[in-house]
Amino acid sequence: MNNLNYGIIGNCRTAALVSETGSLDWCCLPEFDSASVFAKLLDDKKGGHFAFNVGGSYTVTQTYVEDTCILKTEFTSEEASFEVYDFLPRYKKNDKTYHAPPEVIRYLKVTKGEPKLKVDYSPKLEYALGNTEIYIKKDFIVALTEEDEFDTLFLYTSLSKEAVANSEEIKLTEDAFFLMSYNEKIELPSMDSINLDYENTLAYWINWTDNTPRFENYNNLILRSAMTLKLLSYDKTGAILAAATTSLPETIGEVRNWDYRFCWVRDASMVVRVISQLGHTRMTKRYLQFIIDLIPDKNEKLQIMYGINKEKELTEKILTHLSGYKDSKPVRTGNAAYAQKQNDIYGILVDVIHQELVKFKNDTDNKEELWTITKGIAWVVGKHWQEPDKGIWEFRTEDRHFTFSKVLCWVAINRAIKISELFNKTSKLERWKTLEQAIKNDILENAWNEEMQAFTQSYGSKDLDASVLLMESYGFIDAKDPKYISTVKAIGKDLTNDGLLYRYKNEDDFGLPSSSFTICTFWYINSLNKIGEVEEARRQFERLIGFSNHLGLMSEDIDFETKRLLGNFPQAYSHLALIETAINLSKAN
């Protein structure tokens, strides 16, 4: 498997990845950022997995059930066949709360004959740090580790527990189930209860997708991407994760491996900007409440990222005992970027606040809190916009005056002005308008490079950067402006490699990037569309989505040479950009 051919299942509490052959290779319980119970994804030998071994006579295919996040893996031979339905339960209960327990259900449905299989159940708790022992009990199989950390995992099944635990051959004469739970169940699961969980979860996802608008072009891609973004939302707090994994490398064998199971203000704000346009306003409201909860008073500084349970310190650690995906070390947990200064987050957040308040001016319970946050951000931007920062790409060395950061400082003030006008709160209006113009003049004077005929990565630099393409999307410049058109063409010429974009080409902390950052190619395609090159944009879009995996899922990066998917998976950035680009191209049609 060389293309991250995994399906994601989840319930907005945690998620799991199932390979195209039905092996559960990544799962963290009880929550997204908990220690793994299966991590074959990060160490083929030590990580642990949950698979079905059926022999070479079977062909295996995998799809999602209808427009849902229930994954179906079908095993077929001439004599027998069966289907595995993998999902994490999620549905609304009678009291209107959501049932989303930390458990994975694997429902086996016999469709022909009497299939034979061996169950390879090999959990490795706590990132496989110590030995995990398996014990057969009366009602369940329990996995236990108590060396470095104490943890347990409970497996319930309608099949012989002894045959499962010892990986003995099993003949399927009827449908069967596995329920793997972080908690010991008070009421034992049965085939009836499993079927009920399946039907309720199926109904939940069909209802969710039914409330998503349909598009004439690329509808299935938009739907799958929207569902993926929903899976990356954490219902308990409203946080939105950058991805479901840690340490999948941007380049095989190199060290750009990061833990993405956190909530970046930038990434999450971009997600809700798009998902709100699809009518899913609950995610937007939950996320903005997450931000409000993080800033309880006016002196609280906004970090670039947080833990999904609002943690503010995300200490980075290295798991030296794991070999890494395709032997790409290190495997990291935590992320040291939480302490960085990135000035672009302010504008991206206030843009989302403005979008929400325009939509729901008279139906937003927290509009006073959002107005307070807006004023606080405007004050911070006014004090600090002239200072350098680490930029959108989180350079770990020196600070610079990044063009994208400056543009988003302008966005912060521009949207603050619009919000003040919306509520007729005009006491700061003149001061903000003066500041808005000062930032804009500064960018136009210092970010434009006459020799390159483009807005460049940072002031005084000749380096080009894909993030500058967003100047138009955020309203800083018109798509018909000759300087923007020239910038788009310069970036296309300088940063494109076989139709895929570099974020930038100048060497960073780890040398020259050797893979394409997927969202950047979407940004470029979007820009081509905006400047009138619609057919070229459509051609490049259809080529790019061809690099997604068998289920239409995308990771953070694509290798320039092999076109294999790299980086954490599935990636919110990639899927939000896919939606935005697909919608814009659909409108252009």
For the regions a protein language model found, what residue spans apply to each?
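Acidic, mature catalytic/reactive cores of soluble proteins
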Residues: M1-N589
